[in-house]
Design a protein with these regions (language model features):
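Active-site beta->alpha loop and helix N-cap motifs at the rims of alpha/beta catalytic domains
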Residues: 2-11, 15-144
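C-terminal alpha-helical cap/extension of soluble enzyme domains
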Residues: 5-16, 38-40, 200-203, 207-295
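Alpha-helix N-capping/helix-start residues
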Residues: 19, 25, 57, 149, ...
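Short, amphipathic alpha-helical "lid/cap" segments that border enzyme active or binding sites
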Residues: 25, 29-32, 149, 282-289
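A general structural signal for well-ordered alpha-helical segments in protein cores
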Residues: 28, 60, 64, 89, ...
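Short Asp/Glu-rich motifs
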Residues: 54-55, 89, 115-116, 146, ...
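Short helix-capping segments at alpha-helix termini
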Residues: 69-75, 99-100, 130-132, 158-160, ...
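Catalytic alpha/beta core domains of metabolic enzymes, predominantly
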Residues: 128-129, 140-248
Length: 295
């Protein structure tokens, strides 16, 4: 039987950039340490929130290596290695594996809009050439393709596929996946505003954007769910819904980097084509953070 790569709260960590658009490793190190001090169970590096889509291959590899070294086995490190080019996904995976990462996160190939058969071939090709546990990542709003429960079932027969970060918001898909794949194909929420309902349906935790700002809250929320105290967890989820809405007023990671800058965490700027928040949305975010005592 598989064991989950992690249970609880994994931060989908942002990548700080300096004024010239270069990776700010000093600020990144402080953010990593802040998350570990906040109690996170794992760190996911070079994902959507980490702006991996606008990194060069060399930068991507260097950021994963730095994260692994900075973490130094204090928590698990999950390396984003997804690509719509299967060979590139293998290349990034092998470098992450060599760096000492604990697992890989692989988003569905985007833009290509492959079939379910293509998804299976893509993931099996990667698994055949790597050794680390693989977490699938389903986010059809970004990629244009979604797994079906039947495809999850097919892939789950290979123990290297540890489970899936589910960000589709499709609770029917979640329930069908749980029914078809059994208890040892693990699911994690990819949406901060759906942590409690997903964990009530059997998810093992969250890969969280909000944790960059409120790690202790996300740790507490997931721990309450794992302890089957869904009443207390629900109250916490509801309490922070306004903030979570504000953190997604614009596409991730625009608001979370703005929020980190507001609290002095030096997330820095974004790389084009992403740009700074509108003044109206920034004021809404600032007001929400102030109401929660973060400013």
């Amino acid at each position: 039987m598989r064991t989950p790569v992690f249970t609880g709260n994994c931060v989908a960590i942002a990548t700080p950039f300096d004024a010239n658009g270069n990776i700010n490793y000093d600020a990144f190190g402080r953010l990593i340490d802040n998350q570990i001090e906040g109690g996170v169970d794992a760190i996911c590096v070079c994902g959507t929130t980490g702006e991996s889509a606008t990194m060069t291959i060399r930068e991507h590899i260097a950021v994963v290596e730095y994260c692994v070294k900075r973490v130094n086995h204090r928590v698990k490190v999950i390396a984003g290695a997804g690509s719509n080019d299967t060979s590139a996904a293998v290349y990034l995976s092998l470098h992450a594996q060599d760096s000492g990462a604990d697992a890989l996160l692989h988003v569905t190939p985007y833009y290509n809009k492959c079939s379910q058969a293509g998804l299976v071939k893509h993931y099996e090709y990667i698994a055949d050439r790597t050794e680390l546990p693989i977490i699938l990542y389903n986010v059809p709003s970004r990629t244009g393709v979604s797994f079906t429960a039947e495809t999850y079932r097919h892939l789950s027969q290979n123990p290297q596929f540890n489970g899936v970060k589910e960000a589709s918001g499709n609770f029917s898909l979640l329930a069908h996946t749980r029914f078809l794949c059994g208890d040892d194909f693990y699911i994690w929420s990819g949406n901060d505003d759906q942590v409690v309902p997903m964990m009530a349906l059997g998810a093992k935790g969250v890969i969280s954007v909000a944790s960059n700002l409120i790690p202790e809250v996300m740790v507490k929320m997931t721990k309450l769910c794992l302890d089957n105290d869904f009443e207390a967890a629900s109250k916490l989820q509801i309490k922070y819904m306004d903030l979570m809405d504000a953190l997604f007023l614009e596409v991730n990671p625009i608001p979370i980097k703005a929020a980190l800058n507001l609290v002095g965490m030096e997330a820095g700027q974004l790389r084009l084509p992403l740009c700074e928040m509108s003044e109206k949305n920034l004021e809404t975010l600032r007001s929400s953070m102030a109401r929660m005592g973060l400013l």
